[in-house]
């Protein structure tokens, strides 16, 4: 008997609009916004439409972009960026590039290290001194990468599974210095983090004062009001 996990099922919209996707050889590009592009590479063209542990929503509105081919190079152009890929090739710094069309006019070649502004730390437990932060999605250079290649995929019954192959699955955030829009679209892609309702936290009160019993009673009555 197969177990179901209804309570663990996430609401996802993982399949992108067909008109936002471009396939060139073993690569599939999904233009989620004019500044956010998903890049997939799989030699067998086994591309993934399922949600992952990181990415829940790819059903973005139709994007405005053009596609052209010249001398074996596929070019995707939006108002904000130009992506070039040498069709039929593996992903290397010579075969794939993304360039901003506006300031700071950064060009990123696949595999190059990106100096990010970093993100957050999950916990400060056991930390005494400096802490290396996790990668974020903002950069002074204007281009960052979210690599989703190693995350598990979500199944229809609310469980997880491994990917069928060691494919490349990453997202290019080309937002320049518009950090607010970058983070907003990151949450559109991954979903808003769930928050505990305020009532579940109870009353939090901290004050260095020697309360009497009556003062505690008065304080609780204030909270009730």
Which functions belong to the PLM regions below?
Residues 2-16:
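Short, Gly/Pro- and small/polar-rich lid/capping loops
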Residues 5-7, 32-71:
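A low-complexity, Ser/Thr/Gly/Pro-enriched, surface-exposed linker/loop concept
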Residues 13-21, 71-75:
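Short, hydrophobic/aromatic-rich segments at coil-to-beta transitions
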Residues 68-200, 207-208, 220-221:
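Catalytic and substrate-binding clefts that recognize carbohydrates or anionic sugar/phosphate headgroups
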Residues 208-214:
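Acidic-and-aromatic substrate-binding clefts and catalytic sites of carbohydrate-active enzymes
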Residues 215-225:
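Catalytic domains of carbohydrate-active enzymes, especially glycoside hydrolases
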């Amino acid at each position: 008997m197969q177990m179901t996990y209804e309570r663990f099922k996430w609401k996802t919209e993982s399949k992108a609009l067909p008109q936002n996707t471009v396939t060139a050889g073993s690569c599939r590009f999904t233009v989620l916004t004019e500044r956010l592009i998903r890049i997939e590479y799989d030699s067998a063209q086994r591309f993934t439409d399922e949600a992952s542990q990181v990415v829940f929503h790819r059903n973005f509105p139709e994007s405005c972009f053009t596609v052209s081919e010249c001398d074996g190079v596929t070019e995707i152009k939006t108002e904000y960026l130009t992506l070039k890929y040498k069709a039929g090739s593996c992903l290397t710094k010579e075969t794939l590039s993304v360039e901003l069309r506006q300031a700071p006019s950064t060009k990123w070649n696949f595999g190059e290290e990106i100096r990010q502004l970093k993100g957050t730390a999950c916990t400060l437990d056991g930390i005494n001194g400096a802490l290396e932060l996790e990668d974020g999605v903002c950069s002074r250079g204007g281009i960052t990468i979210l690599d989703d290649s190693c995350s598990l995929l979500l199944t229809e019954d609310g469980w997880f599974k491994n990917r069928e192959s060691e494919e490349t699955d990453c997202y290019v955030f080309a937002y320049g210095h518009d950090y607010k829009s970058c983070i907003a679209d990151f949450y559109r892609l991954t979903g808003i983090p769930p928050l505990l309702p305020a009532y579940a936290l109870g009353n939090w009160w901290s004050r260095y004062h020697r309360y009497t019993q009556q003062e505690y009673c008065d304080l609780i009555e204030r909270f009730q009001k």
